A protein has these predicted regions:
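Cofactor-binding loop segments of dinucleotide-utilizing enzymes, especially the Rossmann-like FAD-
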Residues: 6, 40, 87
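Structural microenvironment flanking redox-active thiols in thiol-disulfide oxidoreductases
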Residues: 16-54, 65-72
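Conserved Rossmann-like nucleotide-cofactor binding loop
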Residues: 9, 43, 90
Length: 114
């Protein structure tokens, strides 16, 4: 399963959510979950490079064209946006805005049970 986090370095709520989810990620360590973080090139590279070492997961900084494509494919209206993708590759949950750690953890646990 994959939790995709569309975010930006200049997005205060994005960074706050990452900090709040850190203990949850530790609790779920060893579970079959991959964390993917996607930021656009409107996030300055130097700032992005300084932030990502503290965030466990796979990190991608995409071009404006790639961001536009992903935004269209996943109907991204703003950041942060969270998408949970199941083992078959289906999007099973999407949130624009941080829904809270409890909600994210509950949805991940439910998806793991399938």
């Amino acid at each position: 399963m994959i939790l995709v986090d569309f975010w930006a370095t200049w997005c205060g709520p994005c960074k706050m959510a990452m900090k709040q989810m850190k203990p949850m990620k530790k609790d779920l360590e060893g579970k079959d979950i991959v964390y993917v973080f996607i930021a656009g090139e409107n996030s300055p590279k130097e700032t992005w490079d300084n932030i990502i070492p503290d965030i466990h997961g796979e990190h991608y900084r995409v071009t404006a064209a790639q961001w536009k494509y992903l935004s269209k494919q996943f109907s991204i209206q703003g950041v942060p946006t969270y998408i949970i993708v199941d083992k078959e590759g289906a999007v099973i949950q999407k949130h624009t805005g941080f829904p809270g750690v409890d909600t994210v953890k509950k949805e991940l646990m439910k998806a793991l049970e399938k």
